[in-house]
């Protein structure tokens, strides 16, 4: 039996998250088409560098998933103070380790990773300045990944999606196109646009969490689950 209320709750959390991911993919696809106008070397650098970013993101995703589970447990027990402290603690850990990884992997291991895919010196030269941009970008990205996952855990799902649409298409794309095309910075300009988006959303998400704007959603989430649990317990006792 499919319960409409359960499906509604699933979609209320899942659809905004899917919308956010769709927005990111569309933005990245559009900017990749822009990179294509810079030539084959820029496209090759973009592809290889994106794989390197994936190595750094593995740590961010693991911290975010663990934090999401712990935060949801605290909210389910109506321990909002513990949920808040856990999130802030995870953010501190994430920023420190991501900063270390984003410095060491691109700056120290970047040549080794790139040499696996290519020996073209033009690719190395084009990627080098992007390494420095990634140090700042990954700090913003860790804020997004950890906090957005935790906001979903407490039922605050629409705000991250709306901010993703506004920031990606209102910051990342315009800045990337302006710097990359108009200022002739090429691939570096595009990645500065990505960096501006990640940092903008990261600061906004951190502000939303610290101002407790997520608490009303957490309270609604708790009340809804409390009522379900109460009905289930009552049904068992009959």
Question: Regions from the language model: what does each represent?
Answer:
Residues 1-14, 71-137, 180-238:
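Short alpha-helical transmembrane segments in multi-pass integral membrane proteins
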Residues 45-110, 141-164:
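Small-residue-rich hydrophobic transmembrane alpha-helices
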Residues 22-55, 73, 78, 113-121, ...:
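Helix-terminus/linker motif at the lipid-water interface of multi-pass membrane proteins
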Residues 17, 21, 29, 33, ...:
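Transmembrane alpha-helix boundary and packing residues in multipass membrane permease domains
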Residues 61-64, 134-153, 159-175, 190-206:
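Short runs within selected transmembrane alpha-helices of multi-pass transporters and secretion channels
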Residues 2-30, 34, 55, 59, ...:
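Hydrophobic faces of transmembrane alpha-helices in multi-pass small-molecule transporters and flippases
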Residues 6-13, 17, 33-54, 122-129, ...:
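Interfacial/gating helices of multi-pass transporter permease domains
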């Amino acid at each position: 039996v499919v319960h409409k209320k359960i499906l509604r709750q699933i979609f209320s959390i899942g659809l905004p998250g899917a919308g956010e991911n769709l927005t990111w993919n569309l933005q990245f696809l559009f900017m990749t088409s822009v990179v294509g106008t810079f030539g084959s070397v820029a496209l090759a650098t973009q592809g290889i560098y994106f794989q390197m970013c994936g190595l750094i993101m593995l740590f961010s995703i693991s911290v975010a998933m663990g934090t999401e589970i712990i935060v949801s447990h605290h909210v389910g027990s109506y321990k909002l103070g513990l949920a808040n402290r856990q999130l802030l603690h995870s953010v501190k850990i994430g920023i420190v380790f991501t900063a270390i990884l984003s410095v060491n992997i691109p700056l120290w291991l970047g040549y080794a990773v790139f040499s696996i895919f290519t020996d073209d010196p033009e690719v190395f030269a084009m990627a080098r300045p992007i390494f420095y941009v990634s140090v700042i970008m990954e700090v913003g990205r860790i804020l997004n990944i950890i906090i957005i996952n935790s906001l979903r855990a407490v039922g605050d799902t629409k705000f991250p999606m709306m901010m993703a649409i506004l920031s990606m298409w209102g910051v990342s794309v315009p800045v990337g196109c302006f710097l990359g095309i108009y200022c002739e910075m090429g691939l570096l300009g595009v990645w500065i646009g990505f960096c501006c988006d990640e940092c903008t959303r990261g600061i906004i998400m951190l502000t939303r969490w610290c101002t407790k704007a997520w608490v009303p959603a957490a309270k609604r989430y708790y009340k809804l689950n409390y009522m379900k649990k109460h009905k289930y317990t009552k049904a068992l006792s009959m």
